[in-house]
Structure formats: C-alpha cells, structure tokens
Amino acid sequence: MEKLPELFLSRMREMLGEEYQAFLDSYDSPRVQGLRLNDQKQDKEMLEKICRRYFHLDKVPWTENGYYYEANDRPGKHPLHEAGAYYIQEPSAMAAACLLAPKPGQRVLDLCAAPGGKSTQLAAMLQGQGVLVSNEIHPARCRILSQNVERMGIANALVTNMDSAGLSLHFPEYFHRILVDAPCSGEGMFRKDEEACGEWSPEKVVLCGRRQLEILENAAGMLRPGGLLLYSTCTFAPEENEKTVEQFLQAHPEFSVEKT
C-alpha cells in the first residue's frame, strides 16, 4: 500500500507506545471482509442456507445477521447482491447499530448515513415498525444511499439530503435513537482507501473535530429526553473521538456516557 504519512506515524507512535509495532504489522495482515444477511427480504435461516451454496461464511459474533466471507468469494458480483439478499459491510462497521439497538416502533435517525450500511442494519432491527430517517448532506452520496435502501427492500425509511442544522429545525426532540457516524479524517480507512493517505493532514484532523462537534450539537436537539445518541468515527485521532465527546459533554451536562 501507499506509504503512510510520517506525521500520522509519529502521532500513532506517541499514542500507542509499546503497541505501535503491532499496529504497523496489522497493515500487512489480510483484510477481514463481511456481509450482513437481509432478513427483510427472506427468512434468515433460508438466506443463510442459500448463501452457503456460493460463499464460505463464518459467523460474526457481535451481530445476528453478520458473516465473514473469503476474499475469493466475491459476493458483490453475485445476483443475490443485486436482489438485496445481503449488504456487503465490514464486520467492525456492524457494531455501531448493535450498540444503538433500536426497538421496533421507535423513531431512529442516521444523521450521516451514506452509503447506507448502518442505515439498512438499523432498519432491519426496526422490523418494519417505526420510522428511520437516513440523512446525507452530499447529493451524489445521497443517491447511492437511496439506491441501497431501495435494494434492501426497506419500506419504513425516509431519505433526506440536508445538513445537520437544517434537519434539526424539522425534528426537535423527535428521535428515540440517533446515530452520528461522523465524517472524519479517515485514518482507519488508509488500508482500504489508499487515496485517503494523500488527503490526510494534522490540519484536516482539527477541521474534522470542529465539524463533528457542530454535528453533535445539532443531533442533540433532535433527541427525545431519555433517548440514546451514538457517536462513531473511522479514525484514530483523539481530537475526533475522546476530545470531541469531552467537549460535547462539557456543553451538555444533561448527557452522560453509557458503558458498553
């Protein structure tokens, strides 16, 4: 893969200490790939039986419908994918919806939703009851989001194309559950998307942190009292994770961190 940015490596070395070498070694290990069966289209047991005819599947332990598959399976090329039988999604990305754990009948917001992996997973948990609002600020990515929602056969989802501030005007204290999978500097994507290496800089980390805090502020106004807001990123930077959450909590003492 493309050489990792030196400033990024220096930051990671300082942050990880003795675990730094293991972190570097992880870039040479095979990528873990997964898919999530869509029980909105067919009974899970039947879907699993069908998919095992074509793919080598091993269960992802933290989600009901998630499976690892082997690289040479190429499930994205199979007609079952186009039919919406499953969604190709990294196993780690399946964790957020599992932690948010919406219940059938609840109102749920995925604020930064494209391309739709987490949204379609949240919708499956609603079991056709309640409503899911899947929002994406970028028009081109919003079209992809809409296509995936349609492909997965989700009937109780509304796709919106707004910034978080605009959306918050329409849904004050409305949602039981909100997912903010925030735009970030993408440090966790370097191995998957090598172009992200060239786009990274310490300045981008700072900029992303400011934007994430703004998104969280707007999300807070859309959450019902007693609701649950889950914040996630695909980056390692403390400025975009721990520090963002810390600043948010300082401004919102009515919120507290839930242990998972």
Label the model's feature ranges.
Residues 1-260:
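S-adenosylmethionine
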